[in-house]
Amino acid sequence: MFKRLPLALFSAVLLSVLGGLAWWAGVLYPPIELNGVLTRALGTPEMFRIIHSIFGVGQDGKNIAFVGTTLLWLALTVALGFLPVLLAAPLLGLGLLFLVPWPVALGYGVVYALIRLALTPFKTNSSRATLASTSLSRAGRRNALVTLGGVGVALLGAGITRGSRTGAVDLTLPSAPGKLPTGFTPVKDFFYVSKNLEILDPKIKAANWTLEVNGEVQRPQSFTLEELRALPSQTVDLTLACISNPVGGPLLGLGRWTGVSFAEILKRVGLTANAKWIVWHAADGYTESLPLSEAASLELLLAYEQNGAPLTPKHGFPLRILIPGRYGMKQPRWLTRIEFAAEDRAGYWVTRGWSKTAFVELTSRIDFPLENSPVVKAAQPIQIEGIAFGGLLPITKVEVSTDGGQNWLEAQLEKPVSKYAWTLWSLPWTPEAGSHELKVRSYSSEKVQKEQEEDALPEGATGYHHFIVNAS
């Protein structure tokens, strides 16, 4: 049995390498599709809570999960190597039907069979036929490899059209941004969270992209990026926050966003009486919805610029929707279609137990002193600084405690750059020698930030940001 292991392993690796090459040309890759299936199946708040407790709030958990999925794929294809090729190849093709369309499944089955035939030596029981059989086996392997190469090229060719739709990103648009006021988050520092591995995020070519607007509309239309940019534009300063951001976490940022008002699109397509919901469709299969009645009271923006420059691929190029007062999960990137529907369609994460409404919770954060370096000099005046944010709720007061909440001092607020932006706050403090527990809370009129600590999943984190600072 173990004599077959090298051949089984080599066949599995060669199949995976050819599949990877085909994927770069646009052909679906089974390990990636398998990873997507597992991600969707395990994408519940409870599972994310476990993942975040182990790997934090970044992409590390997704990266490790993909490595695990790839190893699973290799293990399964290696196991096929211990079966006769006439059994293994059909089993592979049939199994892949659960992950990919039948032409791709068939292609993988055929390529795998040819790999096995090309690598398996021919046997003969006649010593007199040794020379002839050796010649035939070499010729057979050579012909099989030629055929394999032809099939591989055909497989790659089949994906060229699809690959051209998701090829290199075209960012030949406006000039570089000017200097932004204090408090804005540079694009390079803006938080990034995706349901995908970053390498699998859509890479859209502007020349091949259109935004389709259809459903319960009177005049279905499609818009190129150039056509959207020709429409009257708006610029909005808006803080975006991720629903998985923990109390005091880094998954929020303030950007200056430019794009087309959603109301402008509404005027151009007109709605039927049946239109009750907006359903957003993204290039990576992500969907979300919003009641049309709520959209009327919000300044929705179809954004194509961030901080004065075109959106980067990570942040949604060529187009994303921005919805004030909601967490990022309600605001898809890489938009390809806006559908007006008579009934709601639960979004990608909603179907997995996440928040239906995703309203931003009232929150505040201490940015200085640093939580990960909480050491200050005793008897030396400093400014405790941070941000507060409430989505659609204006921040009217921020209080800071230096003794763990026994006493509270009111911080000084800076006027926010817009009604959708976070509020910067500061408090002068001269620490005495020793340990001090800093704590912060924010207010919107009579509404106070929730003190009860709750996990970020599924409705958004609550609680006061607090940590110990040592003064010496």
Predicted region positions:
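Structured, non-membrane catalytic/scaffold regions adjacent to prosthetic-group chemistry
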Residues: L28, P84, G163-S472
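Alpha-helical transmembrane segments of integral membrane proteins
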Residues: K3-S11, I64-T69, P103-G107, R142, ...
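Extracytosolic (periplasmic/ER-lumenal) interhelical loops and adjacent juxtamembrane/interface segments
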Residues: P31-F55
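Juxtamembrane/interface segments at transmembrane-helix termini
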Residues: A118-S127, I160-D170
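N-terminal secretory signal peptides and thylakoid transit peptides that target proteins
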Residues: A132-G152
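N-terminal secretory signal peptides
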Residues: F82-A139
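N-terminal signal-anchor transmembrane alpha helix
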Residues: P6-V27
